[in-house]
Amino acid sequence: MLAGCGNNTDKAPAATNAPTETNAAANSGNTGTETAKYKDGTYYATVEADAKTGWQTYALMTVEGGKITKADWNAFNVNNSGDLKKKVSEDGKYGMKAGGASSEWHEQAAKAEAFLIEKQDPAAITLDAEGKTDAISGVSVHVTDFVKAAEAALAAGPVEAGQYKDGGYHAEGEMDKDSGWKSTVDLTVANGNIVAVKFSGVNAAGDDKKQFSVDGKYGMKAGGAQAEWHEEIAKVEQYYLEKGAAPELTAEGKTDAISGVSIHVGEYFTLAEKALEGAK
């Protein structure tokens, strides 16, 4: 598939957008006694995905009247497209309390967001060597990625939000009697844009088609193909992530528009549109 928290590494990854002079830097001394002034609009930035977990943190903020009025600390998973991290936590699937934490991830994220709105400057969230903070009561998770993403977002300036509602979206086709696979599509939307894509499938045994191929069980190269199925579908995912639309397709659902792709891909683009019906 293409496109942090309690198990991030101590060393924070670099943020994606950070000019040398920033509004955030200009207000780095603000701890709430002064009002930070930012241009009104929507602010969004990410940091690099965590290599172990696949979670890619982002900060999404709204500035009104020169002040941060809304803050969203969230993440999407580059290895397993679908629900955003808050939703995973809200559904009880992230399991911090089960692991001994005092509260779930989304509850701690909400406290960090409220602190940022109060202080108006991500630099007010002081960090220790492990990327944690003592500045926010009830927050034990690593907050480095949130701070870095928020700083990068404020540095980059307002951005235009995309057309879709944020969240995870899923669609699946019918079981193919000949192949024994049913196509599946999972998309993640953040700041209104598609940020993660997974084109895969499932068989009667519940196997994930991409993983089935990664494990060497699908056997396309053994059958004479130039690449394995998961390698080809990754190129299709990248195309969709960049273009947001289907390429020109043959009557068989194949395409010459994506180099190195010989598999049938038409159904995935149809299912992607179906999945996004819930995002409009």
Predicted regions and their residues:
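Bacterial lipoprotein signal-peptidase II cleavage site
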Residues: 2-29
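Active-site- and interface-proximal helix/loop "cap" or "latch" segments in soluble metabolic
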Residues: 32-40, 44-164, 175-280
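Active-site rim loops that border cofactor/substrate pockets in soluble metabolic enzymes
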Residues: 171
